[in-house]
Amino acid sequence: MTARRVKLEVWRGGAGGGGFQTYSVPQVEGMVVLDAVHWIQANGAADLGCRWNCKAGKCGSCSAEINGRPALMCKTRVDEVLEFSSVIRVQPMRVFPAIADLVTDVSWNYEVNRRIQPFTPAPGERAPFLMQQRDVERVIEQRRCIECFLCQDVCHVLREHQGQDRFFGPRFMVRLASLEMHPKDVANRVPQLHAEAGVAMCNITKCCTEVCPEHIRITDNAIIPLKERVADRSYDPIRGVLFHLRPSRPPAPPPVGSERPEAGLSSS
């Protein structure tokens, strides 16, 4: 029996430009888009550039745009795409500079990350840290990020308005939220959020949340709380004064009675 063949249009080119080339790929049960790209590489296009690593949806390497939607190639099933289109079009993330074919230069993200003050405990505090379980659960969602940068690619501030000089992007709102909400962190990143990081640039369309493969509620649980924190400390004079006069955070008390046990949380 002849296998059904799938039509793939794959973007080929680099920083100087390029275009789509069409390939006919035999479809097999359970095939994902990354499988199809690998078949193309093994059957006549060995020079097709494609970044990947785990093929399990955990490394974030194989990010691309599939029929215009940012997604991981290893988690996008061919049969599901074909339910809505007879052609599968694969192209690199458009918000980042092209290197070769489906490979983009995402180094800007690492430069931004270095500008964020890392986890900063109170003077004298040392790991292991004791924390209430409810405090751990507040930030565990943000720690699921695999740095696929799909949220950066879909963000209209970065994509449509080239706002890299004014906005860190959703991925780093998640990182800043994980630090700001950490019960043992004492650094004040609100001035950076208000100015350099540009949290006000986001108008909460939730497009970043929609494409996140780890289902992090980026808008609701990271960006909106950070916006509220900036508004409280930057525009409410009473809250601003009280924040600067507040005592340092006391250490979390040990669990007693029937309370849930405390848990450790790695910090980075």
Model region roles, listed by residue range:
Residues 2-109, 142, 152, 156, ...:
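Iron-sulfur-associated redox domains of electron-transfer enzymes in respiratory
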Residues 31-43, 90-268:
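Ferredoxin-type iron-sulfur electron-transfer modules in oxidoreductases and energy-metabolism complexes
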